[in-house]
Amino acid sequence: MRRPVKPTFSLNVERPTRAEFRRAVWSKRNAASPGRNGINYLVYKKLPAAFDLLYSIILKAWDGDIPDNWAQAAVVLLFKDEDPADPANYRPIALQSCSGKIFFSIWAKRLELFMLKSGYFKRAKQKGFLSGVPGCSEHVATLKAALRDSRSSYRQIVVAWIDLKNAFGSVSHNLIQFALEWYHVPTHLADIISTYYEMLVATIETKDWSSKCFVYEIGVFQGCVLSPLLFSMVFNLLLDMLSLRTEEAGYKFKGCEVTIHDLAYADDLSIISRSITEAQRSLDLIDRFLRWTRTMAAKPSKCRSLALKYWSNADDRAGRTRFVERAYAPFDPELKIAGQVMKFIADKSFKFLGWKVYHHLSESKQKKEIHKEFVEYMDKVDGTFVHGFMKLWLYQHYVVAYLAWPFMVYDLDISWISELERIANRYLKKWAGLYARAVTSVLYRPRDMFGLQLHSIVAFYKRLQIGQSFMLKHSPDENLNRIYLSMLARHGALERVWKPSPAMEKLEWQVEQKLRFGGQADRACMGFGRHKRKLALAERKRRVLEAQASSFFAELNLLDIDKAMQGCFLRFTDAEPFDLSWRHLIGTRNPRLITWVLNASINSVVTPDLRKLWGLCPSAECLLCCHSQASLFHILVGCPVALRQLRYSWRHDSVLATLEEPLRRRLGQHNASPCVEEKRTIQFHSANKPSGKRLERRLPTKNAYCSI
């Protein structure tokens, strides 16, 4: 492999400006764990003296004079899984000084920009630790599209997932220096990193004991802001070697001109090939690279393989003979890594970046797991000893958040999603104090329309899928753009699954039409102006999701219009909506009052006319005014006796609001009129001479008293 050419984009090694330093400080989270000195980021944000002192220290450290405490770390062990007695099942997290992390975060941002602008980091391959890149979802979407394409075109595909043994802790410091030199990083930054890694010391701290201070001779700190980028540079050496085999060994899509071979997210690497032979050659290349590093090694026990092939005659699969005429089925490719055969994905699933993969590529087991865990979460929330509206808050912020990732990576049919929503509706109505047959729109419609504005599971799934399609279409990775276009052009597949791509295209078209309408409604009224308005990508995505939410609320309104009695809240448009924010739901408001308001908005409060309708009483008269039809609308707004007794405070407020408008207009006109100030001068006169205008005190006359 040849060394890459020198880049035209140079890395900025100048001292950071005060504005750049301020952005680095304010980008940090206040809740981040501090180092051994106990000083967190909030100190530098709130104290100007500490801010100025740290800025002067960073300017001095920019020349290579790094403080000793920046290279000291307290290592905390976090348990991962399996056996707690095995030290290998713990993840070491280094807690470092916040001032040092601010210094290295400035360098990390500049180094990342340098690697991307120079073309050393390829977005289509390595997506780990890159700012603004949803790497997990993009790689999962790419691999799913490849498996779906091979299945629809009946072509062979071989996938191998490689896991490294202690990836971050096995990178030698000499290898880091080699990667910096290989990618033409300026010597100024390379010397700073070399000095920093020569000073690394750490102690392991637990609740019961602390170890002695030891030198960190190999590996990078997990918790240092610079470590992920340095590891990616070392791992990028392997990706550059594998990229030479992309056209030769990679899998080529049938519907678009895209060839993929290796997908990496940090140390998680997957190899996609068109044949077993080419896949094994790529694995041999990985073995050769790991042996060259002398410190890094694969972990065969956690590596997996999968192969899919079109079978058209009698064959032997999974250890037994099955006679299949035409089938597209998996088989064990028996790939080897580090001299050991990789395990085949059989009945047990393999998790790739949070996506569970089965050998049959079916998602029925995932549906059962999601359904089971969702019911367990709802039962757990229902069993807590808090009032119902606090349970609604737990559902809104925790239970729905659990469904976010499965809804993004799995293709689920709407009927199955609706079943989850029916289960959720039973719990939500119970917690809100609604009747079992109450209309469900009161749970999901906006608060200004007498609703709780909770997350609808169906709408939440569509929102995530539309956001996923938007990401595929506008991703900087060109391969994802082409895959999205092929998905949009494909028809007939997955009929039961709701297709987000056409829905996203329609919503984006609506956003574009609104922009055009804004151009036609300006002062010129001539359509587009001289410059066409363009939205940023984040703003465009936000408007697309807002359009999706508006369409969902419009569907709820159509359902409420169909409900003649429970949709009566639509007639309360002039009434001031009840404040149903979380601050009042779980804090200041009485839960019984909120429950009554919700039931009243859907006409579920027991009234005389409903009792007569149900056959519980012979008459539906109002108990106050003896009106013949005492409906909920009459009780709330139309009873004259209640009006005289000042029970309708909202009605008096509406009268005052009607009087307020002309008074406000009159006061505005009076305040806008010019005010002429009267100039008064003091007139002096001699004491002997009377003034020209004699002031006399006039007493009221008799006629004046008579007029009064």
Residue ranges and their predicted role:
Residues 210, 298-348:
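Short, conserved micro-motifs composed of acidic
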Residues 420, 435-617, 621:
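Extended C-terminal regions of large enzymes
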Residues 456, 614-662:
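Short Cys/His-based metal-binding microdomains
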Residues 31-42, 91, 163, 180, ...:
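Short, conserved catalytic/metal-binding micro-motifs enriched in Asp/Glu and His
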Residues 4-237, 632-647, 662:
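Conserved pre-catalytic core of RNA-dependent polymerases
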Residues 35, 72-75, 91, 126-130, ...:
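Catalytic palm active-site di-aspartate
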Residues 334-412, 467-480:
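Basic, alpha-helical interaction scaffolds
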Residues 616, 668-708:
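Active-site metal-binding core of divalent-cation-utilizing nuclease and nuclease-like domains
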